[in-house]
Curated annotation (Swiss-Prot):
It comes from Pan troglodytes. One of its GO terms (biological process) is proton motive force-driven mitochondrial ATP synthesis. PANTHER family: ATP SYNTHASE PROTEIN 8. The modification N6-succinyllysine is found at K54. Its main location: mitochondrion. The gene is MT-ATP8. InterPro entries: ATP8_mammal, ATP8_metazoa. The modification N6-acetyllysine is found at K54, K57. This is ATP synthase protein 8. It is a single-pass membrane protein. One of its GO terms (molecular function) is proton-transporting ATP synthase activity, rotational mechanism. F-type ATPases have 2 components, CF(1) - the catalytic core - and CF(0) - the membrane proton channel. Component of an ATP synthase complex composed of ATP5PB, ATP5MC1, ATP5F1E, ATP5PD, ATP5ME, ATP5PF, ATP5MF, MT-ATP6, MT-ATP8, ATP5F1A, ATP5F1B, ATP5F1D, ATP5F1C, ATP5PO, ATP5MG, ATP5MK and ATP5MJ. Interacts with PRICKLE3.
Amino acid sequence: MPQLNTAVWPTMITPMLLTLFLVTQLKMLNSNYHLPPSPKPMKMKNYNKPWEPKWTKIYSLHSLPPQS
């Protein structure tokens, strides 16, 4: 059985890995990456509060003297 000659393997594997690295880098350079989304300003909704028009006077406690 003949013996497998592995002396040339490093000279074939090294350029192959370098080529794969360069091709990957070029593909990544040409791809478009989207920016992270910016938050939209929220519009505050004004809800109808039924208690707002009712409380028009400020009542003081009966135990306290009247304040002016």
